[in-house]
Amino acid sequence: MGYSLVNILGGLLIVTSTIVVVSKTIPSAIKWYAIQSVVLVGVLLTLGLTTGATELLMWAASAFVTKVILVPFILNRAYKKMGSPADSTLTSSIKPAWTIILTGLEVAVCFAVVTRLSLPTAEVATPALAISFAHFFVGLTCIISQRNILKQIFGYCLMENGSHVTLALLAPTAPEIIEIGIATDAIFAVIIMSAVVVRIWNDTKSLDSHDLTELKG
């Protein structure tokens, strides 16, 4: 039952990731990212209880603090500093329907790759492992397709969540210091990227990447 629940939660991860990418407003994307992070915590807890790896329980606690609370808080604070800019509703370069189809293809390709791996985890948690791999491509899709530069930050966050699940599945007994390093990198990356976005907004009053092609350092 343990790995079956992990696979179910993995399915919820890709659903929430897709919703984050197709969300039309920053507040909506923040909300769904927080929901996804709660699901991620559930994956870590379930894996910890299933494998007996107490390290994953610590990972779950760390992920709750950093991903469910801190990252949404930082992104929401950056959004409010810009006075809820109107161009937060900029549409993606890819229509939502095509985004969903592309996400499905990315998961299918990763699933095909995972089924060829001779790893213990690949035998019992194939869907979850494939979905964790697919998050890299889903995040990349978000970064490439979104015109809103604040929305592009979510692409990085999705990629980071995917790497988190991949590590938990492949190395559940890895020392907590590794998790601390991953979480710390993610927090500082989001802080720096958010600060840069706010600075760009203050200088240009635009979050549209199409308007920022002539920015100079």
Residue ranges and their predicted role:
Residues 1-217:
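Alpha-helical transmembrane segments of multi-pass membrane proteins predominantly involved
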